[in-house]
């Protein structure tokens, strides 16, 4: 039964991870002008929330989007890695998240009207780290709740 439980969780995290990476890298393949139109449309909907940033509001929204995408990635990588027999569970998800951020920025080098940014790599990796911490924190709370009920 334990092996079935393991496979189920591993498969679930792997599917979410693949979808998340497809979303991240798919957005990086979008030409700069189209990407700007998409974020501009989203900004129109949420502009009141970003009014405090003035004319930098759309810039902040784009960076927050990077951070959020990679927070999800860090969460899924950590959950996936937790469901492997590997003993080391900290370094691999963080390094894989950093690699994904570097790949993302590399894709943007070759996308028309886009460019690469070292700052974006750091923003992305910060998101991965938050996702890692959220996954670990949630797992801790669930384990604690489970052991309290026994």
Describe each model-derived feature in a short phrase.
Residues 2-75:
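"…centered on the first transmembrane helix and the immediately adjacent amphipathic helix/loop
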Residues 8-12, 85-94, 117-118:
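Membrane-helix interface segments
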Residues 17-24, 90-109:
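Small-polar-interrupted transmembrane alpha-helices in polytopic inner-membrane proteins
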Residues 30-31, 82, 112, 139:
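Short helix-capping/hinge motifs at transmembrane helix termini and TM-loop junctions
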Residues 68-84, 126-142:
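Membrane-interfacial alpha-helical segments at the cytosolic side of multi-pass membrane proteins
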Residues 69, 91, 95, 123-126:
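Internal alpha-helical transmembrane segments of multi-pass membrane proteins, especially GPCRs
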Residues 101-125:
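Interfacial helix-loop-helix junctions of multi-pass membrane proteins
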Residues 144-150:
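Short, charged juxtamembrane terminal tails flanking transmembrane helices
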């Amino acid at each position: 039964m334990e092996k079935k439980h393991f496979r189920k969780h591993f498969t679930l995290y792997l599917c979410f991870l693949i979808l998340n990476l497809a979303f991240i890298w798919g957005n990086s393949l979008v030409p700069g002008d189209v990407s700007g139109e998409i974020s501009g449309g989203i900004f129109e909907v949420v502009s009141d929330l970003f009014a405090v940033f003035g004319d930098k509001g759309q810039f902040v929204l784009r960076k927050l989007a990077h951070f959020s995408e990679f927070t999800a990635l860090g969460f899924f990588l950590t959950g996936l890695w937790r469901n492997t027999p590997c003993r080391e569970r900290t370094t691999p998800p963080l390094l894989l998240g950093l690699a994904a951020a570097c790949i993302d920025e590399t894709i943007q080098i070759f996308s028309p009207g886009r460019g690469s940014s070292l700052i974006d790599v750091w923003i992305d990796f910060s998101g991965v780290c938050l996702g890692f911490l959220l996954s670990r924190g949630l797992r801790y709370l669930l384990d604690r709740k489970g052991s309290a009920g026994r």
